[in-house]
């Protein structure tokens, strides 16, 4: 077992484990840690706890110290420098005629590196741009190409539901989302209805998917023939979460709604699925 704390470096960012280095660190505290990018400032979202070896990536990097007001001042200064760096880089991108969109700029806490995040449809030769930026900022330069989902996460915005984007408020990682999830939930497959601001399938399609899959295993499919107290019927509609079925009575050409529980009480029997 390892004693660790969980640290985030960005809102809704991924959580990384660190060795607390003898410190007892409370939730919501801020710390200075050594990372692969250099010295960084992060927020503790998981206080000291014991985790299994399989849940950590070894070797664990250590906390340098608990952050104080002076460290927070440096963070704010870095944010202001990043705004200026964004404008400078934007002008250089135009000067070099590069087909890329600058999304964000970030200084590491110790200012040993400046990271420029961008999107582009293809590969971009930015070697000359890097040289220009290095001569201006006198530090290490990294240009990192990101995808459209990461862009939406960084910039934030309002989703089709009218709420702030999930990815920019609480989702630490992107999980795979498939068109099958929309089909299983009987949603419209119109891309404008099931796509987020990033143009990809909405992350929220994943949230209730397990419940839909479990419920669908218990309910008959649309098109399936069943026997009801009113005679044989064909399932023509299905509200999975409310467990309500619309069935068309074969002998009466009439559509009736039943809850699945009502059908079970009537001794419903599934027959064969029809085309």
From Swiss-Prot:
Keyword rRNA processing assigned: no
Keywords of the record: Cytoplasm, Sporulation
One GO molecular-function entry: mRNA binding
Keyword GTP-binding part of the UniProt annotation: no
Gene Ontology cellular-component terms listed: cytoplasm
GO biological process: sporulation resulting in formation of a cellular spore
Subcellular location: Cytoplasm
InterPro entries per record: PSP1-like, PSP1_C
Domain PSP1 C-terminal: 61-146
Function text: Essential for the phosphorelay during initiation of sporulation. May control the level of phosphorylated spo0A through spo0E activity during sporulation.
Protein's name according to its UniProt entry: Stage 0 sporulation protein YaaT
Lineage: Bacteria, Bacillati, Bacillota, Bacilli, Bacillales
